[in-house]
């Protein structure tokens, strides 16, 4: 090969080499494979909201305000206890006549409705520690001559169906006595007393005193009788719900210990209770 040919060969080779180098430099790098997605932790389950059945026609324990909200002594006490126990609750207006069926069927987790702790009820449901002391009381018109429970034997007596007032009057007059007039609520029975449809009403002292004080035009008076045994209210739960029962008892004990219970009691009844409602239930109000 002549020197000229050699020089051309080298130039051509150099150009080819440079082209190959540029092509190699211009090649894009392949993208690295994307990392496998990391499984996210499951979202925490929402906190359970316990359904509380209450017959909101029993002031001052439970009633509805002008906004339709359920308010009252029971509501404040159990709301405060639930907060202490770290549980969420929701009150649902539930007619008294079906309230325990709703509990038994699981439609309600608890019943808070001035429910008296009785041996009969304890056979089918569990109760929290008592939170209110009650007793039956007679309401009559101011001019009535009734001075004791036995005076009602020949009179027309109004009661709320299925309450301990109903039980007491049934024992005195006989369960099927036509002189016993049964109503869906105690306020309805008291309205009937005001209009003259019945001669007396027997019901829990708290609701009777509240109604009489707020209806001065009815010209009522109240009559106490030692024959009426003390009663206590408790929170009713489905039989065997021991975990919820323990939490509620914990909450009730806490609000009694820190003074919250006394504050609520004074709000509704004008003064703190004479004694705490923490003794065992002694008898078979609402």
Predicted regions, residues:
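Flexible hinge/capping segments at coil-to-helix
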Residues: 34-37, 43, 140-157
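Ligand-binding cleft/hinge of the Venus flytrap
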Residues: 64, 78-85, 165-184, 212-217
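Periplasmic-binding protein-like
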Residues: 56, 132-140, 209, 213-250, ...
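A ligand-binding cleft/hinge motif common to bilobed small-molecule-binding domains
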Residues: 115-123, 170-171, 194, 199-229
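Short loop->beta-strand "edge-of-pocket" segments that line small-molecule binding or catalytic clefts
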Residues: 51-54, 150-165
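Ligand-binding clefts/hinges and TM-proximal coupling segments of bilobed small-molecule sensing domains
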Residues: 164-181, 219-223, 252-286
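Extracytoplasmic small-molecule ligand-binding "clamshell" domains
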Residues: 44-114, 258
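Bacterial signal peptide processing site
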Residues: 25-29
């Amino acid at each position: 090969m002549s020197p000229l040919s050699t020089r051309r060969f080298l130039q051509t080779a150099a150009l080819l080499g440079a082209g190959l180098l540029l092509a190699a430099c211009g090649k894009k790098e392949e993208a690295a494979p994307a990392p496998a997605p990391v499984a996210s932790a499951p979202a925490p389950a929402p906190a359970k909201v316990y359904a509380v059945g209450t017959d909101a026609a029993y002031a001052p324990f439970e009633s509805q305000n002008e906004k339709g909200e359920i308010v009252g002594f029971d509501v404040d006490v159990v709301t405060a206890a639930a907060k202490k126990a770290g549980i969420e609750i929701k009150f649902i207006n539930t007619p008294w006549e079906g309230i325990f069926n709703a509990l038994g069927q699981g439609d309600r987790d608890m019943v808070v409705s001035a429910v008296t702790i009785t041996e009969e009820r304890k056979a089918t449901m569990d109760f929290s520690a008592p939170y209110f002391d009650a007793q039956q009381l007679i309401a009559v018109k101011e001019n009535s001559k009734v001075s004791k429970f036995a005076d009602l034997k020949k009179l027309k007596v109004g009661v709320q169906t299925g309450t301990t007032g109903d039980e007491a009057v049934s024992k005195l007059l006989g369960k099927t006595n036509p002189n016993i007039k049964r109503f869906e609520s105690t306020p309805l029975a008291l309205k009937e007393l005001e209009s003259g449809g019945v001669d007396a009403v027997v019901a829990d002292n708290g609701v009777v005193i509240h109604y009489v004080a707020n209806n001065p035009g009815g010209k009522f008076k109240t009559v106490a009788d030692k024959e009426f045994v003390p009663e206590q209210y408790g929170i009713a739960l489905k039989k065997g719900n021991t975990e919820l029962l323990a939490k509620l008892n914990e909450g009730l004990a806490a609000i009694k210990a820190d003074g919250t219970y006394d504050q609520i009691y004074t709000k509704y009844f004008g003064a703190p209770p004479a004694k705490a409602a923490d003794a065992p239930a002694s008898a078979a109000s609402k």
